[in-house]
């Protein structure tokens, strides 16, 4: 039976491991449940997770690669438009597969999905 999972991430890509752990769980859920629908919604400082080309030290996790892997598995990445704009993210290309979204869409996803997790 198909499950619908919404994961909301609020923290910046680096500094804490909330974005890392949210994306790690998202990737694992899709790997283990290929019939599930999964959406990651990036809010607040997490909107910066969708900026491509961020450099990380060798051996350190890379949020862009994690997002791309999630999209390849069929997951969707939504970025809060007002959160992105408040952080100067406008008129730039987002990580491949990420798309701008709204609070209205987040509200609909929250009401319609089976599970909602926050990081």
Predicted regions and their residues:
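Extreme N-terminal starter segment of soluble prokaryotic enzymes
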Residues: 2-6
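Histidine-anchored nucleotide/phosphate-binding helix
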Residues: 19-32, 40
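Small/aliphatic-rich secondary-structure junction motif
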Residues: 32-50
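Short glycine-enriched, charge-decorated loop/helix-capping segments at active-site entrances
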Residues: 53-58, 94-96
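C-terminal structural segments of small proteins and small subunits
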Residues: 86-119
């Amino acid at each position: 039976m198909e499950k619908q999972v919404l994961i909301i991430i609020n923290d910046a890509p680096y500094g804490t491991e909330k974005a890392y752990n949210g994306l790690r769980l998202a990737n694992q859920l899709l790997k283990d449940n290929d019939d599930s629908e999964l959406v990651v919604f990036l809010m607040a400082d997490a909107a910066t997770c969708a900026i491509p080309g961020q450099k990380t030290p060798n051996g350190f996790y890379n949020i862009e690669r994690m997002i791309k892997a999630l999209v390849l598995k069929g997951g969707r990445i939504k970025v809060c438009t007002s959160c992105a704009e408040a952080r100067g993210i406008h008129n730039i290309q987002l990580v491949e597969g990420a798309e701008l979204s709204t609070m209205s869409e987040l509200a609909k996803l929250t009401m319609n999905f089976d599970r909602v997790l926050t990081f």
